[in-house]
Amino acid sequence: MMKNNALKLRGFLIQCAAGIVAGFLNIALSLAAIKLHVPLFMDTLFTVTASCFGWTCGIVAAVSLHTLSFVVHGFMLQNLTFFFCSLTMVVCVRLMLFRKNALNTMEHGGSKPLRLLILAIVLALVISLEGGLFYYALISLTKYNIGNQAVNMLIYTFVTQNVPMLISATLARFPVNLVDKAAAVFGGYGIFALLQKAVTQRKNSDGSKVENSFAFDSGMGGGIENADEYDEI
């Protein structure tokens, strides 16, 4: 009992640490995209990776990203609102990729790209709606006019055609979010798969038995937590 509790605590702490690292990587990638004038957000790729490890890791990654945004950019109200978009990513990744019924499907290579593509489209739709609502609220209450340049250009293109601001803010986000979330989902899951493979090979070399490809050491060394243990939500 005490040994199991110690393993769970160790796994929890390592998931928290990995989530913080993911937050730093997200902010670094986002700043690089701004510096290189890439018309994407590029701030959630490692949130996807972290979410593949577990709920704890994904949520900590989301919190870390927006906390670091306050440090880097100063206090901006949108960091509080768009934090919910990051949480949406965590929820969607866990529910669409790691529920028990989805787990078996993901083990078949042929369906994996399709499931990832569906996840990217769902994320683009939901987060575009969330982002549009937040943008509309911010611009109505605070005259907020900061954001992704490509999105802003599309918003004002729609507005000049007499499309209502809320609809404009939502529609303008979808094409950018679709590309951004597809990159985040495929890139983030790809990094997770590589790390999973490395840990599985290490276990096999140590003579450990890995029961299935998703029975992954979520702490990368401590606190074994199978992916399907998170299904009870």
PLM regions with names:
Residues 31-41, 75-80, 100-231:
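Membrane-embedded alpha-helical hairpins and interfacial helices in multi-pass inner-membrane proteins
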